[in-house]
Amino acid sequence: MKHIISKLAAAALLLPGIAGWGAEPFRLGACFHFGSSASGDVEANLNLFEQAGLNAGRDERSWRFVEWEKGELRYFRNGHIERMISRLHGRGGCYINILCYAHPAYCGGERIPKTPEAIEGFCRYAEFVTGETRGKAAFQQVWNEWDAHPGTDTLESHRDYVKLLAAVVPRIRAADPSVKIMSTSATMDYKLENLLKAGVLEHVDALSLHPYVSWRGRGKDTVESWYGLMQRMDRTIRKYNRGKPFPVYITEIGWPAAITANGFTEETQAVYAAQLLCSVRTLPFVKGLLWYDFQDDHVRPGEAEANFGLIRADATPKPAYYVFADLSELVRDGEFVRRIETGDPKVWILHYRLNGDDVYAMWNYHPDRNTQIVLRNEAETRAPVSVRHAGRPAVTMEWGRRDWLRQKPRQADELAFTLRDMPLLLRGDLSRVRLVRIETVPFPRELPINKQP
């Protein structure tokens, strides 16, 4: 595909930014497993977490680990989750506390509390934990993935959830008037619709989504597919909220770097992390994103669940960690301005403002093509720009290029870049810059199967 975009056409194709981000800072972070399993080196995790510029963490205090004997609530401080909560709170971060999972003494073989006794038991547990985390937890999330077990994805089951919610929310608010209430995490769009039909919006301050696509199979497990899912979920939410958006937190999302049918290489995990971070702020209803999870759960290459982490079990950073560390400032503090239309839905150029600079985040979703773009700077004085791939060191480039492959004369006001899957970031004064040319050419990223080593 080859086409030239004129100055007039390019201006017409600029999409306006979405206003109204709200006063709350965007929350970017990851999930931990300190609350129940106490897994990981807390200090090593938190040091790397803070160095990456993350400001949100999520963990749980499961019911059965608080009410050890029926009727006896005891908050055993294991020293892990408490240090995480205190450090996060001390740095102005956001802690999301999960209240979750059935207690065998109340629920028997059921996976959810349904009887009056079980609901009252859950309410006592929830208000107790809320009191213990008062002033430090920004959110109490009532349950994690209610819809994840057989039979719990139905409308009837979600009505059971809203019944529990109606009972427990007043108790939580009484225990900590400042805390906000977050819904259980919807894992698929039809499950989200059942949750909304059941009346969840009457009781919560924010919705939680777990929009995983990593399990959907090749071609449907990409960030491009995730973005389409998020757009559908937004439309569903508006359908049940009088046409208006509702605050959403993506409290789990990730791709496992594992040797499994639904696994990915560490390089692909990093690429998807970068595409995810660069595009999430184009969805104004999303107020926060937490990667699942910060640390690998184990050293088991053939187990997907053990390999979602940004760091290994011994705290060695993975490539995706460096992507998070590099892009965290842009995601947290940047202002999304517009998406620059390229004429190709698989070629993305996003315009941000960050600390007085313009930032372009640019990549393509084509699995087997390169895209060359040409930018022209019409300013009288053209300052150098910073250029880097996400997670990599930046280089400085002066404006001016010669298209020697076509034997064209030098253009003092132009720069050309090749876009592939890893986002390329251009930073500087781009106020008079426009896209003047885009060309996509075949360029496979992998060897044919019959030629792979």
Model-based region annotation:
Residues 401-453:
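C-terminal beta-strand-rich structural cap/linker in extracellular carbohydrate-active enzymes
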Residues 255-325, 339-345:
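Aromatic/acidic polysaccharide-binding cleft in carbohydrate-active enzymes
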Residues 52-214:
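Substrate-binding cleft and catalytic face of glycoside hydrolase catalytic domains
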Residues 1-9:
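Bacterial N-terminal signal peptides that target proteins for export
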